[in-house]
């Protein structure tokens, strides 16, 4: 896994930016009826600077973008607007799944959240058992108000000085 690096994406340009736009358009842009240009516009305003949110992080293997995640004050979970900030858009390229990319990304989430001044994060997902091994605590199952995925599981990570390391 030491060939995987995680770095902050700060510019709306380059191969990594193009990849995250493509991933997000295919993942939720199409579902939400957005064009590729609309997703690109959204992503260009999702990079942040300094300690401000949102922030976007890219996983690279041998210099190539293979995954991403974002820290954000908001998410599209309309049923729980009282929960924030969020870990969103956790994505690993299909050809890289099962090869340690998610673990490498999760090992940096708490540190990056703490650097942004956050004390905790929320995420929602259908995946049962994935995030628990990285220190996330299941909170509740909530409605999403979407027909394709009517309920999701909400998790919380207490950032503190946590450094997540998973042994295989």
Where are these regions (language model features)?
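Active-site beta-strand termini and strand-to-loop segments that position acidic
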Residues: 60-62, 157-158
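Short hydrophobic/aromatic beta-strand or adjacent loop that forms the aromatic wall/cage
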Residues: 54, 149-155
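Conserved N-terminal entry element of GNAT/NAT acetyltransferase domains
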Residues: 1-18, 160-167
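Conserved acetyl-CoA-binding loop-helix of GNAT-fold acetyltransferases
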Residues: 89-92, 98-111
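Conserved beta-strand in the GNAT
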Residues: 56-58, 64-74, 86, 91
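Conserved active-site alpha-helix within GNAT-family acetyltransferase domains
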Residues: 115-119, 125-150
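Active-site rim helix/loop that mediates acceptor-substrate recognition in acyltransferases
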Residues: 24-60
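A conserved beta-turn-beta hairpin within the catalytic core of GNAT-like acetyltransferases
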Residues: 74-87, 97
């Amino acid at each position: 896994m030491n060939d995987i690096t995680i770095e902050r994406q700060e510019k709306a340009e380059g191969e990594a930016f193009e990849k995250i736009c493509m991933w997000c358009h295919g993942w939720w842009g199409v579902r939400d009826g957005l064009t590729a240009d609309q997703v690109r516009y959204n992503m260009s305003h999702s990079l942040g600077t300094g300690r401000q949110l949102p922030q976007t992080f890219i996983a690279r293997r041998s210099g190539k973008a293979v995954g991403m995640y974002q820290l954000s004050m908001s998410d599209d979970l309309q049923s729980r607007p009282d929960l924030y900030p969020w870990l969103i858009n956790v994505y690993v390229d299909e050809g890289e799944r099962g090869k340690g990319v998610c673990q490498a990304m999760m090992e940096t989430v708490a540190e990056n959240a703490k650097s942004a001044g956050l004390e905790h994060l929320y995420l929602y997902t259908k995946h049962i058992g994935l995030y628990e091994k990285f220190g996330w605590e299941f909170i509740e199952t909530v409605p999403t108000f979407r027909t394709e995925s009517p309920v999701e599981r909400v998790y919380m990570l207490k950032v503190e000085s946590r450094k997540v390391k998973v042994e295989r």
